[in-house]
């Protein structure tokens, strides 16, 4: 019985991890106040079509790989910006945005409003669908 419960939990985790969901409401993000960085340099610049806001921690084993993956997307696609916020010692940010795992990625529209949220390593086809809705190709 315990083995069955563990199997169901593992399958559920694999299916849901990296999937995103639309965000209801119009919550705007101020990158400057969050302490967002781009290549280690503070920034408050949004992408012309979309911004990928990655929340990471020092201890996140998957965050560097996701950072590289999203930076490559930014390089390939026009109008897209990728920025990062380290929440290792900033529990107030994790609480404000209900972040329980890293990486967590928010897709922001050109006004800085959260339109999509992904917990874990993003599934690229799903992320691309959301970016295309914002005109990123």
Set out the residue ranges of the language-model regions.
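N-terminal targeting signals for export/organelle localization
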Residues: 1-34
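The canonical Cys-X-X-Cys-His
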Residues: 60-63, 105
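Non-catalytic, surface beta->alpha helical segment in thiol-disulfide oxidoreductase systems
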Residues: 107-137
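Thiol-based oxidoreductase modules, predominantly thioredoxin-like and allied folds used
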Residues: 78-92
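Short active-site neighborhood of thiol/selenol oxidoreductases, capturing the structured segment around
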Residues: 46-58
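Structural micro-motif
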Residues: 98-106
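Anionic-ligand binding region
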Residues: 34-42, 48
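Typically the conserved alpha-helix immediately C-terminal to a functionally engaged Cys/Sec
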Residues: 64-77
């Amino acid at each position: 019985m315990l083995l069955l419960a563990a199997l169901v939990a593992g399958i559920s985790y694999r299916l849901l991890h990296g999937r995103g969901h639309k965000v209801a409401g119009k919550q705007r993000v101020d990158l400057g106040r969050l302490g967002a960085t781009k290549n280690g340099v503070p920034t408050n610049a949004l992408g012309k079509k979309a911004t990928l806001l990655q929340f990471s921690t020092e201890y996140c084993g998957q965050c560097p790989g996701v950072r590289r993956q999203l930076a490559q997307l930014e390089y390939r696609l026009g109008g897209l910006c990728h920025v990062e916020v380290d929440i290792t010692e900033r529990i107030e940010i994790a609480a404000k945005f209900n972040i329980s795992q890293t990486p967590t990625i928010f897709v922001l529209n050109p006004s800085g409003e959260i339109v999509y949220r992904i917990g874990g390593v993003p599934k690229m086809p799903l992320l691309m669908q959301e970016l295309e809705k914002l005109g990123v190709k």
